[in-house]
UniProtKB/Swiss-Prot annotation:
It comes from the Bacteria. It catalyses: L-rhamnulose 1-phosphate = (S)-lactaldehyde + dihydroxyacetone phosphate. Pathway: Carbohydrate degradation; L-rhamnose degradation; glycerone phosphate from L-rhamnose: step 3/3. Homotetramer. The active site is at 117. This is Rhamnulose-1-phosphate aldolase. It comes from Yersinia pseudotuberculosis serotype O:1b (strain IP 31758). One of its GO terms (biological process) is rhamnose catabolic process.
Amino acid sequence: MQAILSSWFIQGMIKATSDMWHKGWDERNGGNISLRLLAEEVEPYRRDFYQQPRKVELTQPAPELANSWFLVTGSGKFFRNVELNPAENLVLLQVSNDGMAYDIHWGLTQGGLPTSELAAHFQSHIVRMQVSGGTNRVIMHCHATNLIALSYVQKLENASFTRLLWEGSTECLVVFPDGIGIVPWMVPGTDGIGTQTAEQMREHSLVLWPFHGIFGSGPTLDDAFGLIDTAEKSAEIMVKVLSMGGKKQTISREQLIALAARFDVTPMAAALDA
């Protein structure tokens, strides 16, 4: 048996949370991450599990995730503290076989619960599992500064917001050809915002919460981080462009189509026409 603190998933979560905090995306207890794990990935670390796991009822049943394992950031925990004490700030949990509850097997050594956005994470995991054939295993939420800033001055519409980001940096269409989805402003930590986010996740791997932050999905922690990082970099460029008086020239529709053909991706049609 191996020590869980040396596992690839704990070490990966330490790196992701540290990187996100250093980016300035996760002030105080802002942001949350969940990583879906396979049973064989957690099995070698059972000696570190609690002998009597704590059971917590889900606010919304998730039978599609029955028996699934997740590594999740804790509610009220600071990303900057994860690398200092991962066992206090992270939690390894398993959804019950009926999808009505979960058991806490490791972590949260000072008590507490997984992220308050667990409902949004689980609903998004269900959808991304379906649309990706099970390859998407990460849901990541943070307060990316420039994406939030743009939500105050741009029309909150999927196609036009996507087009703006595609024009902000050439790599964007290649990295997220499926564009960005947007939900209305809603109270966070509720089942309702989770439902709205999951609906957008059916078509988009990025979902903007206006005036709040961004949700991203991907196969790995690196993929999800890189996705958000790319969109945020484009948003930063566009914030600077707007502050200098707006665009004088930009990437054209024809150039975007040529870019998609070169990298063999299918761009969001509505964004091409926005």
